[in-house]
């Protein structure tokens, strides 16, 4: 079973992987991740490269390069233990492969290392990971419409994701959140999103830090009666997010989505709302209102 499970998951993901490979971002990222392998193993690229092998073969890895690659494999396996989606697995592989490539190229020749770093910087500046464009029942807010919508009908419960397009965690969570909206959206339970990377005043108003150091993105907030009831991740006294895994199971359990969904389909009754959560610290496919995915 230990072998069959990954194979089944791989076969199940083949259609999605094939769509990824057709996109320039993933093609170029895969090429950069395999750059050292191509340079070291493919003639005539490998001819004339320095090597520490006893046989002097420049087209094969020396012992130090093998050690670095083995260390890379161990790091990727440890990081992927906490990954939830295929996107997170692939993203970890690409990120740590590029770090290993930079080390290997600098070890080979400082000029090759500088060239590789330059290519990576150009790639980061010119290529952005594709946004999730699948089916969803999510309303996208801007800095003006979010307050209006929360106050418009206080009988409606809202779950709002505060995200930024540059955040890898937000991109990985996008298909999970979309799937939840398809399963649980109803008249009394709605799902929304707001880009706090674009609307910084919203991030300040709802106390969601966009700094990568705080790890507060994405943030999910449950609103009932127009007021915040709970959020994940919670914030500690230093303003940093308490570690929390954004999996579908965790969101359903923590936000009581099954109960909220059943309650939202019935006429509202007094005392139906979830009691407001005590904070850890005092730290502070429907698109409307002119917002759409391509605008973000």
Swiss-Prot record:
Q: Please indicate the residue ranges that the annotation assigns to the motif Di-lysine motif.
A: 293-296
Where are the bilayer-spanning segments?
Answer: 103-125
Gene Ontology annotations of biological process type: brain development
Positions carrying Phosphoserine are 211, 243, 288
- Could you tell me which residues belong to the region Disordered? 266-296
Q: Which residues lie on this side of the membrane: Cytoplasmic?
A: 126-296
Tell me the keywords, alphabetical order. Disulfide bond, Endoplasmic reticulum, Membrane, Mitochondrion, Phosphoprotein, Signal, Transmembrane, Transmembrane helix
- Has the keyword Membrane been applied to this entry? yes
A single Gene Ontology CC annotation of this entry is: endoplasmic reticulum membrane
Q: Which residues lie on this side of the membrane: Extracellular?
A: 49-102
Notes concerning its domains: The thioredoxin domain lacks the 2 redox-active cysteines, suggesting that it lacks thioredoxin activity.
Protein name, UniProt field? Thioredoxin-related transmembrane protein 2
Q: What does this protein do?
A: Endoplasmic reticulum and mitochondria-associated protein that probably functions as a regulator of cellular redox state and thereby regulates protein post-translational modification, protein folding and mitochondrial activity. Indirectly regulates neuronal proliferation, migration, and organization in the developing brain.
Species annotation: Pongo abelii
Cross-referenced PROSITE patterns = THIOREDOXIN_2 (PS51352)
Record bears the keyword Metal-binding: no
């Amino acid at each position: 079973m230990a072998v069959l499970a990954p194979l089944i998951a791989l076969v199940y993901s083949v259609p999605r992987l094939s769509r990824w490979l057709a996109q320039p971002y993933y093609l170029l990222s895969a090429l950069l991740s395999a750059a050292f392998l191509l340079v070291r193993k493919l003639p005539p690229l490998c001819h004339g490269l320095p090597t520490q092998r006893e046989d002097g073969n420049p087209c094969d890895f020396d012992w130090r390069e093998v050690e670095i690659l083995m260390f890379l494999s161990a790091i990727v396996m440890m990081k992927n233990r906490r990954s939830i989606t295929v996107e997170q697995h692939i993203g970890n592989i690409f990120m740590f492969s590029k770090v290993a490539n930079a080390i290997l190229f600098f070890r080979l020749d400082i000029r090759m290392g500088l060239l590789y770093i330059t290519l990576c910087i150009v790639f980061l500046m010119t290529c952005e990971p594709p946004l999730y464009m699948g089916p969803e029942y999510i309303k996208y807010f801007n800095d003006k419409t979010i307050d209006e919508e929360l106050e418009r009908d206080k009988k409606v419960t809202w779950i709002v994701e505060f995200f930024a397009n540059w955040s890898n965690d937000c991109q990985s969570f996008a298909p999970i959140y979309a799937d939840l909206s398809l399963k649980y959206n109803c008249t009394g339970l709605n799902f929304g999103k707001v880009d706090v990377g674009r609307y910084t005043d919203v991030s300040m108003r709802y106390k969601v830090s966009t700094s990568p150091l705080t790890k507060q993105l994405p943030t999910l907030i449950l609103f009932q009666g127009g007021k915040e009831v709970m959020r994940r991740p919670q914030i500690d006294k230093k303003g940093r997010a308490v570690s929390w895994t954004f999996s579908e199971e965790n969101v359903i359990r923590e936000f009581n989505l099954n109960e909220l969904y059943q309650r939202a389909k019935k006429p509202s009754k007094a005392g139906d709302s979830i009691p407001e959560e005590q904070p850890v610290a005092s730290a502070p496919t429907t698109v409307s209102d002119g917002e759409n995915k391509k605008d973000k």
